[in-house]
Amino acid sequence: MTGNNMIKKALMPNPEDRIICVKVGKVKRENLYEMTRKYWKVDITRARKATHVLAIVNGIVQEVYIPVDWKYTDDPKHIGRCEFFGTEDEHTTYIGKDVSDFYGKSQNPVKYINM
């Protein structure tokens, strides 16, 4: 099947995974990490418990990161927002999965799963 006829596979998270999904705009692959990692309104205590951060574009997981640390940004334009530092999860099965059911009609770009 191709195009709009493709069946989207829903994300079925591992129960042990603590996931933060963040919606990012359509970006070039080389910019995806930077777009995913910073300037989020999150509860930093809760965010630090996350085992995975998923980059979401149009409801689909584009990349998965393992966060190493979260901190409040030093950027004066984004006071009170958080950013993480992490690495790509090379063993993930989440890429290409649909997360639309987790967001519903929510406009919030951040979604917590299993947290």
At which residue positions do the language-model features occur?
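Compositionally biased, charged N-terminal/linker segments
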Residues: 1-61, 91-115
